[in-house]
């Protein structure tokens, strides 16, 4: 069985540009959704039953927040994405996602983008996984934020020692019921949306940056409040 993909991720080229251009492919992918495009053009059907997250909670209008947080998972390798999520903690200790930075850009660019994200969202508490280059990233982002006149953020780089895969799996129900995304999050952050909605419970996942950071949200709120989340 030969699998011929319309788009080659490694070379960033199309199988046959005259039949389907790269621009047209990405337009179709955005319109029909990554899962359908993947099945139609990449011969990679997504296993719907095998998805880790079977549902996502959404919100239309922002609540009142008792605190604005940021959770950042820096890229471990060149193939990884930096995933930085700003979320508001509601009075009943739910999380509403306000802003997402999800990129493969090099650290020298993302440090500035991260600092802007912290400043623009008036974040109170920044938690950054300090594994690999996270500690230096945290230091530089904090310096840039202060240079730009915002001093309201407390930076907390910390070492994440728990197993990533088991953290993601064991917290999936908490994520489904306690993390709320904007109703238009598919349009706002298409790559992040794709990473969350196609992540498989078992089998090979190329990347886990998005689920890792979202798992960090529920861990952060649980540790900060010592509250028991409702698991359905």
PLM features per residue range, with description:
Residues 10-11, 48-49, 77-79, 93-94, ...:
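Flexible loop/turn segments at secondary-structure boundaries
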Residues 1-10:
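Signature of the SF2 helicase/ATPase Hel1-core->accessory helical subdomain module
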Residues 86-128:
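Nucleic-acid-processing active sites and adjacent nucleic-acid-binding tracks
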Residues 10-72:
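ATPase catalytic-site recognition across NTP-hydrolyzing enzymes
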Residues 62-89, 213:
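Gly/Thr-rich phosphate-binding beta-strand-loop-beta motif of the actin/hexokinase/Hsp70
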Residues 74-77, 102, 132:
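Short, glycine/acidic-enriched loop or turn micro-motifs at the edges of active sites
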Residues 35, 39-44, 78, 85, ...:
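C-terminal nuclease/phosphodiesterase catalytic domains that cleave nucleic-acid phosphodiester bonds
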